[in-house]
Amino acid sequence: NVSDGVTTVYLCGDSTVTDQSAEIPYLPGACYASWGQALPAFLDGRIAVENQAHCGLTTETFRQEGHMDIVKHFLRPGDFCLIQFGHNDQKLPHLLADREYPVNLRRYIEEVRNLGGIPVLVTSPGRNIWKEDGTYHELLAEHVQAVKDVAVSTNTPVIDLHEFSVRFYEKTGMERSCGYFHPGDYTHTNEYGACLFASCIAAGLGRIFPEVFHVTAGPSDFTPPENLWDLLDSQNNRAGGTEQKEQFDAMEKSTAALLKALEEADQASAEE
């Protein structure tokens, strides 16, 4: 239960948003962490964060597994609902940016508003993947644009985490940017990356809703050491499992597997 006078922010999303599990011994660079779990550090005590995001989910499976039902059950008028999907949707033909993906986003927005809540769309953070010529490899452009189009058509606020992340990678460079990700992973952040992205989300909320969100400084001087991956052993942190959501998360550790999955989804969609 949330006390009266406290606004709740509900988070709907995938592994880049979810509360990741802690590891012992704790090392900020070696553990998985997502911006959703770091967000409270940037907001004052009048805001509660309820993270319903889970690994491997899409705009479809988030609903199918009952997570949206939980949000709708507890959401009160004036509460906020941040919605970020895309990494896993783009691996399925029927959830591509010109198919059911925007339809699902609109449905979430409508449901939140019908309950008196305030929906906010968030574009997915970019992957730290680069082309052989040294330029950034943009893989989410279509889904990011779909989010922006839905935001315009439904008059919904949007926080462009994708733009923030890609600009950061290009400014910082691939090697240095790796320090913000779990070792061997180019999609899932560690504590450094979680705090970096949470700062963007908090700043966006403060800019759009200054009367509600008062952004704090968050962790100070929280940056990874150089060559972090060289300092850590990533071999014991490989994903496994056979469920779709586990397979999707495992793909993010292999650039080749990821690119193949995205290509197959595009081909399957074109053949339908």
Feature annotation, model-predicted:
Residues 58-66:
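Structural motif
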Residues 208-236:
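C-terminal/domain-terminus segments
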Residues 14, 54-57, 87, 194:
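Gly/Ser/Thr-rich helix-start
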Residues 66-217, 261-270:
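Alpha-helical cap/lid subdomain in secreted, periplasmic
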Residues 229-272:
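Acidic, Ser/Thr-rich low-complexity intrinsically disordered segments
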Residues 1-53, 69-77, 250, 268-272:
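Serine-esterase "nucleophile elbow" of acetyl-processing enzymes
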